[in-house]
Amino acid sequence: MSESVVAGAGHRVPINPASRARAASSAVLTRFPLCPNATPEPTAVFRNTAAGTGVALGHNGNLVNTAELAARARDEGLIGTRCPAPATTDSDILGALLAHGAADSTLEQAALDLLPTVRGAFCLTFMDENTLYACRDPYGVRPLSLGRLDRGWVVASETAALDIVGASFVRDIEPGELLAIDADGVRSTRFANPTPKGCVFEYVYLARPDSTIAGRSVHATRVEIGRRLARECPVDADLVIGVPESGTPAAVGYAQESGIPYGQGLMKNAYVGRTFIQPSQTIRQLGIRLKLNPLREVIRGKRLIVVDDSIVRGNTQRALLRMLREAGALEVHVRIASPPVKWPCFYGIDFPSPAELIANAVQDEEEMLEAVRHAIGADTLGYISLRGMIAASEQPASRLCTACFDGKYPIELPGETALGKNVIEHMLANAARGAGLDDLASDEVPVVR
């Protein structure tokens, strides 16, 4: 029996309270908001089938045909034409369609019927009272791994999670693969042909450094990025410091390659979350001050090289450099362990629109560098090249998604008015003023260019 799903916001959703003593499977989901207006509602989805069986679903990623799936759910009578809550996310719509399909067959067959029609980036875990299922989209944009315990199995979005619970890594779940895990063991079914396009930003920022992706250590990748960054963007300075945590390995690599000493110039408050994934600018800016504090005795009077993982909006770096100068840094040279982020992500990262991406404002490369340098207040600014970052990952370029850096989206996006990024939020806004699902085709849906 399955006991419960624990959502990232701390919500517990019981599946069958009477079965707690016999619980054999459970799921934990911690997922950051993918839309700027996201609310701290439960991120796990729980649905009942017509037969009364509970279905719980967790989703990492973002769909690009949400409008199409929402219309299908509406046509099946699963969502009212006004689309009231709780259908507030692409995950909720998937859960509704799965539960509906399982009413006429099995949950496994419902998944095999539904998954080929779902487009976008998705790693799904879902379960009924007897079986845990896990799958990845055919492009494998997000990682998903299978682990083994003495008396059970574990599925996790990072291998570090397997280590934490004492599970041994078995293998990555393949793109286009559906796993079913029950009392008889694990069985695998292919629901689509694989076309691997793993997100390179997992190596740069999203993944924990103690995880491995496609057999490559995230920490080793970040250190190697730092070494290559030092070769591509050298500068004379007294000390290399990293912006913790994801910028630290690259800073170590930069120091190793350049011969400039590495030092810990910033202290991180371990009780503050990652600022990039906060849903609003106000919370992000407050988080920067709460999260980082300069070690004045280390940086006072020094020419600093500050290595960070990425620049998205530029707010973190602007506030950070102001803090470093106030603490006595003579010069601040910024080096970035990824290329300029110029394009929004529709596959599970909150890069919502080009207007919010600081590197997108100017197309000429040199002018862009100068504009960003001036905006964040750095003495010099350097990014690693796309080629250098890919080489550090030791993955073939053909197997990576680099859309946020070069605009080449591996999963075809639908017409601009049907993009799934904020379509559910827009639909609910329409519902509040008396419109419905049919208005998804209107020109009022937010357009991302």
Identify the function of each model-found stretch.
Residues 58, 127, 135-136, 147, ...:
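Generic beta-strand/beta-sheet core signal
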Residues 104-105, 234-238, 256-263, 298-300, ...:
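Secondary-structure transition/capping motifs at alpha-helix termini
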Residues 161, 168, 176, 232-233, ...:
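Phosphate/diphosphate-binding loops
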Residues 259-304, 315, 342-352:
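Short, glycine/charge-rich flexible loops or terminal/linker lids adjacent to PRPP-binding catalytic cores
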